[in-house]
């Protein structure tokens, strides 16, 4: 078809066209420079480094996932290998273990684990919602302090910055209190030294800091920098903070009943011991692979439930309270800087 379009017309001699006079045949087949640059710009970057980085990331994820279960998976693999080798090489009698009881036991075990994990997740999610309420109430408290407290003539009321510093100390001490740890030394920068010295003499230093803030507001009311309506509004916010703290302490001090933790772990261990015995007759040398995969899933689910049931303790899925406290501190610093033109809190 293309040859027909380029054929010589009748009555006309074939010859080079005007725009082809200065172009030789080898040069006519070369791509246009602009086209070459466009193709070069549109080419994707080399995939070698990105591919290596992706493989390394996946490898680290697999190692982290395997390490999450811990030594339980390793001992399970050894047990599976021992059962398989003993059956395939040394055992002369066949094991005719029906799979129906094993299937029913596995189904009942999954229901039990799901019920326990659902209760554990509800505790974790409630703890996260309470810390979210703590963030919101902290912003409300800072906003009310900065806007409702009256300033003396010609200067900014220093109690505003003092209350914000005390609140940063409060949330950090609360995070340590929920972990069962003493108040960190960094809090010294936010509260008076004599007040911090009482840290070891009380069983709830975070609540003492909140009580001290309420006492400061009462002094401001007596000094005429607050009226009764604004004081009541600030006190209502302090009550919201105290309610959130009480909810967190309820979760921290009331663990799941012991059977919720012990029986799922016991049943999973027994099931993992029985699985290779029931599968070795049909799977042979592939028994360790199948049994270890099944055991890994059950052990991982059990470990997740164990971590979620204690949301404030150090684990893979703990509530990131330090990060939340840093968020509250940054929010209060920004609010103070915008309202008072001050520097960092503390």
Please provide the spans of the model-predicted regions.
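Short Gly/Ser/Thr- and charged-rich N-terminal loops/segments
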Residues: 8-13, 26-29
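N-terminal juxtamembrane/topogenic regions of multi-pass membrane proteins
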Residues: 34-132, 151, 283-285, 327-346
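Transmembrane alpha-helical segments and their cytosolic interface motifs
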Residues: 68-76, 249-281
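Juxtamembrane "helix exit" motif at the C-terminal ends of alpha-helical transmembrane segments
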Residues: 79-95, 269-298, 302
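Membrane-spanning helices that line or support transport/gating and their immediate boundary helices
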Residues: 120-124, 133, 144, 300-311
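Structured inter-helical modules in multipass membrane proteins
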Residues: 144-260
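Cytosolic/matrix-facing juxtamembrane and C-terminal tails of multi-pass cellular membrane proteins
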Residues: 295-299, 304-346
């Amino acid at each position: 078809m293309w040859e027909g379009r380029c054929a010589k017309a009748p009555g006309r001699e074939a010859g080079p066209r005007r725009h082809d006079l200065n172009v030789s045949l080898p040069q006519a087949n070369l791509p246009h420079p602009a086209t070459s640059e466009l193709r070069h710009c549109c080419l994707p970057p080399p995939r070698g480094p990105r591919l290596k980085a992706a493989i390394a990331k996946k490898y680290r994820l697999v190692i982290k996932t395997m390490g999450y279960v811990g030594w339980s998976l390793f001992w399970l693999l050894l047990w599976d290998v021992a059962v398989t080798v003993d059956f395939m090489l040394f055992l002369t009698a066949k094991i005719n273990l029906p799979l129906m009881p094993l299937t029913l036991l596995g189904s009942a075990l999954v229901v039990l684990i799901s019920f326990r994990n659902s209760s554990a997740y509800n505790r974790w999610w409630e703890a996260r919602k309470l810390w979210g309420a703590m963030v919101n109430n902290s912003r409300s408290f800072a906003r009310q302090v900065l806007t409702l407290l009256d300033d003396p003539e010609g200067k900014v009321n220093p109690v505003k910055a003092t209350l914000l510093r005390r609140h940063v100390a409060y949330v950090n001490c609360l995070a340590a209190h929920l972990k069962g740890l003493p108040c960190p030394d960094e809090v010294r920068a936010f509260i008076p030294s004599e007040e911090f010295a009482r840290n070891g003499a009380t069983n709830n230093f975070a609540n003492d800091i909140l009580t001290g803030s309420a006492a400061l507001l009462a002094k401001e009311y007596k000094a005429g920098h607050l009226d009764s309506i604004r004081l009541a509004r600030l006190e209502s916010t302090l009550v919201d903070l105290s309610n959130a703290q009480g909810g967190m302490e309820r979760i921290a001090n009331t663990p799941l009943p012991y059977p919720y933790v012990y029986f799922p772990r016991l049943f999973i261990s027994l099931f993992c011991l029985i699985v290779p015995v029931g599968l070795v007759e049909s799977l042979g040398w592939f028994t360790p692979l199948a049994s270890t995969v099944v055991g890994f899933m059950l052990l991982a689910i059990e470990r997740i439930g164990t971590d979620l049931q204690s949301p404030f303790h150090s684990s893979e899925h703990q509530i990131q309270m330090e990060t939340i406290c840093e968020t509250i501190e940054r929010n209060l610093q920004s609010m103070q800087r915008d309202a008072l033109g001050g520097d960092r809190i503390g």
